[in-house]
């Protein structure tokens, strides 16, 4: 709530791995550092990027090797999950925008969601049986649920690219993010999309996520 209320620290957080808990703290603190009114996608992507970067730096300085390895494994799984859900949402958007009749759209929607579950089962096998997303898949799957994930993560690559562009210097990164945040919404979106394209190009060249 950005200081308006005493935000709870739930007891469930205490059992999180060290890196994940550090990421949560940096994420929430990022909202106090920069918040743009009426732009949830910007705010959450900025905070998510800061959470990731902050956790990396904190673990590099203070974390044990086991904690760093555990965090990287967790992060790779989350990246796999995000790629899966993003691809599924793009499929659904294409179906909704098509000229098919309502019955055909519904049938295709259920086929796509069934495929999503199957692909998650394959990911679980690739992860050695890790079931951290089982609860998410046990709930009702729909486009709104997938859109919520997109809100938090769609623009994260843009902020990671901005951090790299600013020489991995946090003060410079914050200043650059503030400048973008003050732009009119259409220009702000265009600037972030351009940065996302840079991040995608780096990832393609490295065969990874765009970060070393």
Enumerate the predicted regions with their spans.
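Acidic/His-rich structured neighborhood in mature extracellular/periplasmic domains
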Residues: 1-78, 93
């Amino acid at each position: 709530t950005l200081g308006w209320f005493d935000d709870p620290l739930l007891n469930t957080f205490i059992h999180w791995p060290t890196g994940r808990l550090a990421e949560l703290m940096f994420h929430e603190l990022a909202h106090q550092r920069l918040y743009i009114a009426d732009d949830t996608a910007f705010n959450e992507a900025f905070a998510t990027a800061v959470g990731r970067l902050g956790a990396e730096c904190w673990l590099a300085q203070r974390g044990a090797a086991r904690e760093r390895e555990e965090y990287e494994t967790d992060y790779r799984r989350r990246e796999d999950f995000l790629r899966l859900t993003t691809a599924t949402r793009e499929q659904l958007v294409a179906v909704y925008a098509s000229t098919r009749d309502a019955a055909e759209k519904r049938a295709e929607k259920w086929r796509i969601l069934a495929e999503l579950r199957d692909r998650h089962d394959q990911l679980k096998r690739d992860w050695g049986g890790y079931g951290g997303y089982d609860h998410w898949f046990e709930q009702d799957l729909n486009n709104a649920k997938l859109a919520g994930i997109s809100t938090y993560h769609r623009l994260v690559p843009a902020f990671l690219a901005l951090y790299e562009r600013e020489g991995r210097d946090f003060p410079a990164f914050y200043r650059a993010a503030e400048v973008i945040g003050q732009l009119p919404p259409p220009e702000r979106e265009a600037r972030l999309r351009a940065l996302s394209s840079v991040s995608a190009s780096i990832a393609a060249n490295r065969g990874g996520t765009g970060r070393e």
